[in-house]
């Protein structure tokens, strides 16, 4: 699975890169992947799989998916 960490979310992975390859044994809820990556839920505003926004609590991902996480935006 290819995972994109948007914005400051790169700091939640050791390599501090915007993209990472991870492998999962079979279909998992996206929430379980977030747990494995140790990203606090409040830090993710949007989760997308293969370019479509999804509900991480109910969406099953596979090893062939491309996942993107985006933090909340700031500004005015």
Residue ranges and their predicted role:
Residues 1-75:
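Ubiquitin-like/PB1-type beta-grasp interaction modules and other compact soluble beta-rich domains
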């Amino acid at each position: 699975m290819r995972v994109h960490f948007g914005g400051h979310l790169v700091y939640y992975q050791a390599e501090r890169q915007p993209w990472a390859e991870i492998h999962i044994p079979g279909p998992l809820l996206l929430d379980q992947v977030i747990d494995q990556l140790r990203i606090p839920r409040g830090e993710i505003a949007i989760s997308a799989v293969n370019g479509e926004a999804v509900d991480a609590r109910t969406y099953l991902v596979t090893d062939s998916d491309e996942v993107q996480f985006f933090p909340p935006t700031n500004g005015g």
